[in-house]
Amino acid sequence: MLKLQLSNGQIIEVEEGSTLLPLAQKLSDKYASPIVMGLYNCEECDLQRPLTADGTVDFVEVNNSVGMRVYVRTLLFMLIAATKKLYPDVHLEVRNSLGSALYCKDNSERKLTAEDIRSIEEYMHRMVQRKEPVKLLRLPKSEAIDMACANCSDDNLALLAQVPDDTVLTINLLEGVPGYLFGPMCPDAGYVPYFELLPYADGVIINYPDDGNWQVLPPFVDQPRLNDAYQEAEEWSAMIHCNTVGKLNKIIDLGYAEKIIQVAEALHEKKLANIADILESHHELKLVLIAGPSSSGKTSTAQRLSIQMAVNGLRPIAISMDDYYKNRVDSPRKADGSYDFECLEAIDLELFNEHLQRLLAGEKVKMPKYNFRTGCREYRGNELQLQENSVLVIEGIHGLNEKLTPSVPAEHKIKIYVSALTPMSFDEYNRIRTTDMRLLRRMVRDSQFRSHDAETTLKTWSDVREGEEKYIFPYQSSADIIFNTTLIYEFAVLKKYAEPLLRAVPQSAGMAYTTARRLLNILSYVKPLEDEVIPNNSILREFIGGSVFKDAL
């Protein structure tokens, strides 16, 4: 018998080899939404996975971001299985997220029609009604590969082949269709009733509920410019044969990593030069606003873009939004009483816009400097006056929000959205989430420059994400230009820095430990890459150190 300690301290005994599913069903009335996953010794655990040792047990319900990942993973497997059943010659590839939706590209010669997509959706809803079981098999590596061969690409099989020979792998089965998707799934299709399929571009959109509101299906909001940025990155990475982890590993093994680094960095330089050309052709331009989510590389982007602007004869002048914070005593507060420095109201908008108007009128302006120690704005004698061809460059969280700069006419400003839209995936079904890549960047940077351990970064990440959802993502469609800061090789470089930090997160850290173990698992598939040849102006240097722009970071 195994002894399990529940979250309330109760000790229960279960037979070795039993699963968490009966216990989850027994405790379901204590949760506001369905339980979709267990936490077994603080690690993610499928409800159908056999238990082999004593440990602690907790449960994750669907109505949060962690539970919604299980929901979406199950939904995706249903889409894969339904498509295989109805249209065996169709091959879907999971591409990228668009709000609370996933875009899957149809890579087959026989393209899905709108009627085909309706048929697949109806088939999936019948799965829900039947509560079609999502079976879980724990198989030795060789057996798992044999089973997966029928439904896996070369990239998927390459990942399976890479794990140690004595590994026991988890393969899922839905209506006889095998799948190897990273992470737990719901026990049956009845857990995921809310979704819709929509024809989109060269494939299909799978739309699903937002985190925290699992019973409401929001309308799909198209973001064509963002999707175009994703598709451009994915097509480029495929063109240079480095769009999956397996291909990156092969490049590293063959000794071609330095070339991939050079090519990726050259792409950034080319893109920034193109943006500078657009800015130079915008003859009435007075203001460039740069915004994006955490750890997108906004500061390095602003610095490198300023250099390219100077090449074109412009005079970029940086203004820090931090210097326009209200004095701390006047700052807005959150519901818990703490200061809210992320909301737009934390900025002295009246003073900021007054200074913008005066600067654009050619006046000399005394510039403030915010003292974070005292929580007050100070004036230290710094004055600013724009010259001919001067362009203000402002980087900040609210740059895309029109309420930040209402005093500046639209013809005088350009908004740039910056984010790490990674095209890298493990295979056609297991993508690398952009939020995970940014979290790894932030964790490494916090350790390198802010003396924060990984536990601290992981515990505050949900607050960071909440701010992004509130202050950045709603405005990204208003951007005039999107710049993708991802680097095709960075996953392998971040591995070297991130793994020791993640291993140091103690089990007592709760969900931070759970996230650390999940990130360690995905990092285990990529081979490490040394960083000596990464140039000192690389956006990645903003996070790993050695940046020529260190004074601006």
State where each predicted segment sits.
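Hydrophobic positions on the alpha1 helix immediately C-terminal to the Walker A/P-loop
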Residues: 301, 305
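Glycine-rich phosphate-binding loop used to anchor ATP phosphates in small-molecule kinases
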Residues: 353-411, 457-475
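Conserved lysine of the Walker
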Residues: 298
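Ubiquitin-like/PB1-type beta-grasp interaction modules and other compact soluble beta-rich domains
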Residues: 1-76, 80-100, 109-110, 122-123
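Conserved NTP phosphate-binding and transfer environment spanning the P-loop NTPase/kinase superfamily
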Residues: 283, 405-553
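Auxiliary tRNA-acceptor-end handling modules of aminoacyl-tRNA synthetases
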Residues: 49, 56-68, 91-270, 275, ...
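Conserved nucleotide-sensing/catalytic segment adjacent to the nucleotide-binding pocket
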Residues: 317, 326, 330-373
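Hydrophobic anchor at the beta1->P-loop junction of P-loop NTPases
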Residues: 288-290
